[in-house]
Amino acid sequence: MAFIEKGQEIDIGAIKAETQLSAEALRLKERRDRELADIMSGEDDRILLVIGPCSSDNEEAVLEYALRLSALQKKVADKIFMVMRVYTAKPRTNGDGYKGLVHQPDTSKAPSLINGLQAVRQLHYRVITETGLTTADEMLYPSNLVLVDDLVSYHAVGARSVEDQEHRFVASGIDAPVGMKNPTSGNLGVMFNGIYAAQNKQTFLFHGQEVETSGNPLAHVILRGAVNEYGKNEPNFYYETLLNAIERYETMGLENPFILIDTNHDNSGKQYMEQIRVVRKTLQNRDWNEKIKKTVRGFMTESYLADGRQNQPEVFGCSITDPCLGWENTEASAEEIYATLTK
């Protein structure tokens, strides 16, 4: 039992220097980041749509998707604000399987972390500079935050990480919105405790030194459904659950109440077409209740170029992890959201 060094110490500064945003690209990102913050705080009433592939396994397929999404964003910009999922690290239930671009930048070759780190920055950089979109990623490894803190505009803490103290404390120092998912058990208290920790100042050791954070007022809820003790999925985007979550926001006195509905995972039972119904039902719930309309203001949707999933990367733009909506269904769903909001 041991840690075995497999290479020299990685120079993160040198890797970041290769993909620094130009002054023009930085201005674009900062403008979009301000818009996103205004949406999170309620100053901007547009719907947030965090959307993109389950995992970013193929740079060219992801870029093709990003170009299409950028064009779609322009069509719906007055009602919907899109941040593209560029998810580069994937949690695995038992440690097996594809772990994301950071581990394996080329799915036909053996894992390579040094190449993976470069590939992660390259992909976020290209999406921003070539499409004008900004990006979201899952903070699976808090120690890797320094790799992308200047590029990623939205961070998510996953269902398996939300109870972890380091994730919570690091989230409290991030200068960007952090969505915190309910755990797979569905326990909303665990998630809200995580949000409380993230919204408050914390002192801890990070990268070898003692740090104090300012607290992150944009830490917020992502409802992703749950799995019960019998292994059956239990959605939590329903009317009563939303009111329960809103009541917890009020009781705990948290800042900027905001609920994002994860339309896949256990809200859809990983039946990718069900994502459309989840969105539709949530929009109805918003119409029925003013508190829900004021607080439930976003969706996280898994979508790619081709419908479904595959075990091996044979079809260009088809997920190799969770099944996703293909492009035609993605476009139709976004247009349906837009039409509903325009009524």
What does each model-identified segment do?
Residues M1-E43:
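N- or domain-start disorder-to-order transition segments that initiate the globular core
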Residues L26-K29, D57, R92, E130:
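Long, contiguous binding/interaction regions
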Residues A37-D45, T251-N256:
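Glycine-rich phosphate/diphosphate-binding loops that line cofactor/substrate pockets in enzymes
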Residues L48-A61, D322:
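Conserved phosphate/anionic-ligand binding catalytic regions in large, soluble enzymes, centered on
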Residues G52, I261, G326:
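Conserved, mostly hydrophobic/aromatic
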Residues A66, K79-N244, H265-K270, E274-K281, ...:
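Active-site-facing alpha/beta catalytic cores
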Residues S303-L341:
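Internal helix-turn-beta structural module
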